[in-house]
Structure formats: C-alpha cells, structure tokens
Amino acid sequence: MMGVDRTVDVRGGAVADNESQGSETVAVGLAPQAGSAADAPADTLADALAEVGSSPVTSDEGTGPARRRRRSSGRWAIVLAVLVLLFALPWWTLFSAGTDWPLPVVVVSAVVFAAALLAFPVLIVRGHGSRRLDRSSRIADTILGVVWVLFAWSVLSLLLRLALFLSGVGDPAGPRIVSVAVAVVAAGLLAWGHHEAMRLPRVLRLDVTLPRLGRGLDGTRVVVLADTHYGPIDRSGWSARVAEAVNELDADVVCHAGDIADGTLDQRRGQAAPLGTMRSRLAKVYVTGNHEYHGEAQGWLDHMAELGWESLHNRHLVVERGGDRLVLAGVDDVTAESSALTGHRANLVGALAGADPELPVLLVAHQPKYVGQAAGGGIDLQISGHTHGGQIWPFNFLVRLDQPVVHGLSRHGERTQLYTSRGTGFWGPPFRIFAPSEITLLTLRSA
C-alpha cells in the first residue's frame, strides 16, 4: 500500500513530503539542553595509563600545587602497582614457582616480561594519548590482552592448588605441569578470542513486550549496534559486512548506542563510511558514547548526520506506524559533562521536552547505569552498550561493579526495561573471550 513519509524538523522549519512505500515518520528536532551527568571511571587500565598525569585538576579552596602533586603521585603508584602485579604473577606461575626450568629459560623469560612491562606504559601513552599512533596502539593492546588472560588463568591455577592443599589432597600436579597447562589454555583462548573479535557478529533476536505500545507498532523491528570501536586495526571490510547484515534484517529503526571509533575522525572516516549505506524504514539514530569524548564528539555527531543518521543529542524523534506513535529519544553519554564541550551532558528532561507523555518511549543511552534516571522518567525501554559483555573473561565481574547489568534484557521499576548489548566490535585488545559480539534485532510487541 502506498503511503506518505513526512518529516518535520523543528530546527529548520522545513517540511518534506515524499511519496514512498512505508509509514509516516514525524521527526522533532530539539536543541541540546543542559543537564547533569556523572563521570564514569576509565574503561580499563589502558585508559587510566593514557589519562594519568594529563587530566586537569579542578582548583578549589585548600588545593595547592603540593596536594595536586601528591594526588598525581598516588595515581601513578596505584597504576604501576597494578601493572607489576599483572606482569609478575604470570611470569612467576609460568617460569618460577618451583617449576625447575633451566636457568637460561628463567632468565630469558624474565627479560621478556620485564621488557614488556617497561614498554607497555610508553606504548599505551603513544597509542591512546594525544599522539594516537596506531602501531603503538596495536602492540600495546595485544600485550594487554595476552597479559590479562595469562594473569586470570594464573590466579585460577593458584586458587585451585590452594583449595586442593587445604582439602588434604595435596598437589596432584607438579608446578611445571601447571605452568604448561596455563600456557596452553591461554594460547588456545587467545587464538579463539581473536577469531571471535574479528568475525562478523552473529544476529541475536529477541522479542520485547512494551505494554504501552500501540497495536499499529506491534512487530516494529529495531536493530541495535553499539561499540563498533573502529580503531588502529583497519576493519573497513568488516564494517561493510556489518552494514550488509543490517540491511538484510529489513529494520524499521536502526540504533547505534555509541563508541563509534577510537582516534580522530580523519583516521577512522574510511572504516565508518559503510554506516552511510545502512537502511531503515523509519529512522537511523545515534548517541555519543564515552569514547567520543576522548576525541571529537561534536565531529562525530556532525559526521553521522552527513551519513544520514539522526544524532539524538539530548533530543527526540516521533515515528508513526499503523496509526500509532513511538518516541525515540537519546541522551549524551554520562561522561559528556566533564568534556567541557558546550551543550554536551546527559539530559533526559531536555531530550523529552515537548514529547507527548502518553506515548511509549524508547531511549538510547550509551551506559546501562543511566537506567536509574530512565526509570525515574517513566521510560519504557532503554537501549545501551558500553559493557562489551566484559569482552575478555573474567573482566565481566569487574564491569558489574560499575554497571547494573552486563548484558541482556532486564527490568527496572514497574515500567522500564533495559537491553544491554555486548557490542558489535571490540575495544583495545583484539580478543573476545566468552563475550561474543552481536548485532541485535529487537522486535517490539504490544501487550
């Protein structure tokens, strides 16, 4: 049946009527509003290293140069202590701890681990700091992934041996066997994890029932992308395949929940280009993630608009299908306020200004932790990313300390549901272990 797509943009006052196959879409563009936000901690140790010593210090009463130096020294001490532990425990498990390896093996391994430990902070700062050197990033990210997996399995091996010892079983396996087992398991997981990170994400399909959704919107198909993180590894071909997969899903709405890329817009323009080929019947919407605020947040908002996406920069659209309407709202990431960019902060009140309170609302907010505000504002469904599902097990347990949910559909309060994507790409270490990437197809159902 032929219909009329109608788009109204309050910002420019333009009205365009186009004969097309589909339903009516009404887009209401609101100017960014000011609001409140809370700072989020650095995603990983790598982020902390890239930022430590370079973050501005707010001058308040009683804060002088000596106190600022003490704070900076304290941060460095914590970061360096964590680094030493991350590198030292795997070396001790693999090459010391009574393994009785020949002395040359012990010495060479110590030199290799020490060199990696000393080089890692330099590479991180060169790669993820202001210089943004891709080669340094690739090396540092790979080192971080390898060391994290070795560290995790070294801890597990020590805990298992301790449990056996305390239970009176003794040590059924010699230290050398344990070290070989840790190395083999880690190598296997890293090989598999690299494949998981680089492959085309699988499509995860899920029905979500929204009691306030009109029957005309029943069956609305919402494709969710998040955390593509185009970065120092050129994934232009992967990006094109993701776009093809999205187009095959015949979506009504496509959402990108932030963290498009790491690096400058000029560095990642080619990898992001396939985003412009994605199709939807009603809308393609995007919000900023925390990584946009490590670089060019406003630049990415403008570029996504050039690629045909609606940037929900504390604003909303209203889409109509089958005579029923749905509000698509979005807010900046919660770290936006600390970026000092004018008009950038998470502001749900501004995003919903002028929206009919009787209509159901789908909110896109990068971090799951924003669901507290969403539930308080009566949001029906929040879509988020950020967590990567932990990306490399067992990092998911650390993520859970900062976020209410790591992955999946959850309920918060009487009305609000939250869907948290594990992400479409990966950040930093090119590995995904027990946290597969996804392209999500949410089918909205009326009660």
Write out the residue ranges for each language-model feature.
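Hydrophobic alpha-helical transmembrane segments in integral membrane proteins
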Residues: R176-V180, A187-R212, P232-G237, G295
